[in-house]
Each structure stands twice: as C-alpha cells, then as structure tokens.
C-alpha cells in the first residue's frame, strides 16, 4: 500500500510539473502570436502602399487621358 501511495504521489508530482511547463510554453506561444500579428499588419500596409503607388499612373492616365 505504501509503494502505491509513493507511485501515485510521484505521478501527481510529475503531472503537475508537466502542466506548469505546458502553461509556460502556451504563454510564450501567445506572445509570439501577438508579435506575428503586428508584423503581418506592417506587411499588409507595405503591400497596400505599393499597390496604391503602382495604380496611380494608370489612374491619372484614365482621368486626364494623357498617357
């Protein structure tokens, strides 16, 4: 009976450590996702700006009909 209690206590202890490590890893992953979202926003802004600049000459050509 005593060895059963020891093994159950050991399993509980190891499980608790495992859960705390998983929680820390999950928190780190969430922080990375937040950083990735900010980087994606910057990339989208850059793409949008480059597309707008590329479309300007075509727009002037259509409006003023001087190509």
Curated annotation (Swiss-Prot):
It is found in: Secreted. It comes from the Eukaryota. Keywords: Amphibian defense peptide, Antibiotic, Antimicrobial, Cleavage on pair of basic residues, Cytolysis, Disulfide bond, Hemolysis, Secreted, Signal. It holds the Pfam family Antimicrobial_1. One of its GO terms (biological process) is defense response to Gram-negative bacterium. Disulfide bonds join 61-67. Its main location: secreted. Expressed by the skin glands. Residues 1-22 form the signal peptide. GO terms for cellular component: extracellular region. Residues 23-45 form a propeptide. Belongs to the frog skin active peptide (FSAP) family. Brevinin subfamily. Antimicrobial peptide. Has low activity against the Gram-positive bacterium S.aureus (MIC=12.5 uM) and the Gram-negative bacterium E.coli (MIC=25 uM). Has weak hemolytic activity against human erythrocytes. This is Brevinin-1CDYa. It comes from Rana dybowskii.
């Amino acid at each position: 009976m005593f060895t059963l209690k020891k093994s159950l206590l050991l399993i509980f202890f190891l499980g608790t450590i495992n859960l705390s490590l998983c929680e820390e890893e999950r928190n780190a992953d969430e922080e990375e996702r937040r950083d990735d979202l900010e980087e994606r926003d910057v990339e989208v802004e850059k793409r949008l700006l480059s597309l707008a600049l590329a479309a300007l000459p075509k727009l002037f050509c259509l409006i003023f009909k001087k190509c």
